[in-house]
A protein has these predicted regions:
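Conserved AMP-binding/adenylation subdomain of ANL enzymes
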Residues: 90-91, 198-215, 223-264, 278
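Conserved AMP-binding/adenylate-forming core of the ANL superfamily
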Residues: 13, 33-77, 81-85, 102-107, ...
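Conserved pre-ATP/AMP-binding loop-to-beta segment of ANL
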Residues: 12-14, 29-30, 148, 160-179, ...
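Conserved AMP-binding A3 loop
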Residues: 42-46, 175-199
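Gly/Ser/Thr-rich phosphate-binding loop
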Residues: 237, 254, 259-266, 276-338, ...
Length: 525
């Protein structure tokens, strides 16, 4: 059964991403576009527009040809938007790297995308230069002063402010080559056209519109799909002002909300967790906040409710993949209350099926199955990897997400877990996210993750890694979960740790914990 959005279809304009995002820039002049929270430095819309034109002109003068790749390896800074849209305006394609990537990780992405240019900042220059050398990147730029092997970014902006005249087909030409998370091996390059990224923004705006008076704070990284699409492009399209953070620190985050009177938080579950449970929250004036939006990973009903009750504000979710150009569903910002634990409702122009993973047959309405989606925001495939593309994108245009979901009778979507992350306990499928939601509701638990431990008798047993808020015994937590789930879904062991490994986007890096479990089993065997 094909499920369609409850919202009427929207028109997707036939324009490039910069044309769409920057359509109203000339009318905004001295209005702040991006505020660097760490320094207080402000980039106005006039400065943004001029910087983008200069960047495009500079890249053309340096030899960037349409379709060639410009890489950005930096945290959330105003120059990110200048470089991103400057490269696209010049006809280039952008790939974004985590500034915390190792030399090998960065070199892999640079080589895989055939990047010709790379922009970074001084603290990451050594890694960037080593990676660029391994990958054959021709030119490296750095913010601030030039350094050995790297030109100053300001030099790139010194070739006038007339962008090159390039022809871009929004439906065919790529805007971004973004890497999948890489939590299970080397990442894959996700090919996204201008039209796909424009479609995602138009669709999301139907459910969650932004106005020019908004002042969201965005701790999630711009190099991540959610950060650049919502924290940067959606905000700039609306003519709003975004307050950025180079990294998340709870005290700095709260202070910035108070200082800049932020109206919204664009975050991920760890940020919602801090707002719901951290004692520092009570020391700051957060009365300007109107909403909190969480993405990048599932947010439990308990945590969503706890945050909403503490702040007295709307707390919603959005769901999507890099492969879906950002968005599949979102909590509507239309006055109705968010449904706790739900990732919202399908955005317009999007179709979905919920299927039995092994057969592809549709499951009965309201039951759990793998989510397949189809819409104009989807990727065209994985770069240079037709085999991997064929595994997830079928001939009828359905993207097989690998996520287990259910969609209720009212059209609200609930993410149950990743198909590949299910723990197989004596033939039963155990969803780690369900157990994490239960454990996260315990007052002594600050953070947690659940993975499978190889077991000769059971196949795998669920093991909880827990960061304690206060003293608590593992047996108490095991009993707490056992009282709330069926026997196959009980946690069988608890490991206390100082922190849960997460990606910069807030996703639990289960591979690290799973590797630890496999290593422990080998040592004990």
């Amino acid at each position: 059964m094909i499920i369609t959005s409850a919202f009427s279809e929207v028109d997707i304009p036939d324009v490039t991403l910069p044309e769409f995002v920057l359509a109203g820039v000339s009318d905004r002049g001295a209005k702040p576009a991006i505020v660097d929270g760490a320094s207080g430095r402000v980039l106005t819309y006039a400065e943004l527009a001029l910087g983008i034109r200069r960047c495009a002109a500079g890249l053309a003068a340096r030899g960037l040809r349409p379709g060639e790749v410009f890489a950005i390896m930096m945290p959330n800074l105003p120059e990110f938007a200048i470089a991103y849209h400057g490269a696209l305006t010049a006809g280039g394609v952008v790939t974004t790297l985590s500034p915390l990537a190792t030399v090998d990780e960065a070199a892999f992405q640079l080589a895989d995308t055939s990047a010709r240019f790379l922009l970074t900042i001084p603290p990451f220059l050594e890694t960037a230069l080593a990676a660029a050398d391994k990958a054959g990147v021709e030119q490296v730029f750095v913010l601030g002063a030039a350094a050995s092997g790297a030109s100053a970014f300001s030099e790139l902006l010194g070739h006038g402010d007339t962008p090159p005249a390039v022809r871009i087909d929004p439906s065919r030409d790529l805007a971004a080559l973004l890497c999948s998370s890489g939590t299970t091996g080397w990442p894959k390059g996700v090919m996204l056209t201008h039209r796909a990224l424009v479609a995602a923004l138009v669709e999301l705006d139907r459910l969650a519109p932004f106005g020019e008076r908004e002042r969201p704070i965005c701790p999630i990284p711009f190099f991540h799909m959610a950060g650049q699409a919502v924290g940067m492009n959606k905000v700039l399209r609306a003519g709003a002002t975004v307050v950025t953070m180079p990294r998340f620190d709870v005290e700095e985050f709260l202070a910035l909300i108070q200082r800049f009177r932020a109206t919204a938080v664009l975050g991920a579950p760890p940020i919602v967790l801090a707002l719901a449970k951290h004692p520092l929250v009570d020391r700051y004036d957060l009365s300007s906040l109107e909403k909190v939006v969480s993405g990048s990973a599932p947010l439990s009903a308990q945590l969503q409710t706890a945050c909403s009750e503490r702040l007295g504000r709307f707390v919603g979710q959005a769901y999507g993949l890099t492969e879906t150009g950002l968005i599949i569903s979102a909590s509507p910002h239309d006055g109705r209350p968010a449904r706790p634990g739900s990732a919202g409702m399908l955005v317009p122009n999007t179709e979905a099926r919920v299927v039995e993973p092994t057969t592809g047959a549709d499951v009965p309405a309201g039951e759990v199955g793998e989510l397949w989606v189809r819409g104009p925001q989807l990727m065209t495939g994985y770069l240079g990897n037709p085999e991997a593309t064929a595994e997830v994108l079928d001939a009828e245009g359905w993207l097989h997400t690998g996520d287990l979901v259910r969609i209720d009778a009212d059209g609200w979507l609930f993410v149950v877990d990743r198909l590949k992350e299910l723990i197989k306990y004596k033939g039963h499928q155990v969803a780690p996210a369900q157990l994490e939601a239960l454990l996260g509701a315990h007052p002594a638990v600050a953070d947690c993750a659940v993975v499978g431990r190889p077991d000769e008798a059971a196949g795998e047993i669920p093991v909880a890694y827990v960061v304690r808020r206060r003293d608590v015994a593992g047996d108490e937590l095991i009993s707490y979960v056992a009282e709330r789930v069926s026997p196959p879904r009980r946690v069988r062991a608890v490991v206390f740790v100082d922190e849960i490994p997460r990606s910069p986007a807030g996703k639990i890096l289960r591979r690290i914990l799973a590797d630890r479990e496999r290593g422990a089993v080998r040592l004990n065997s």
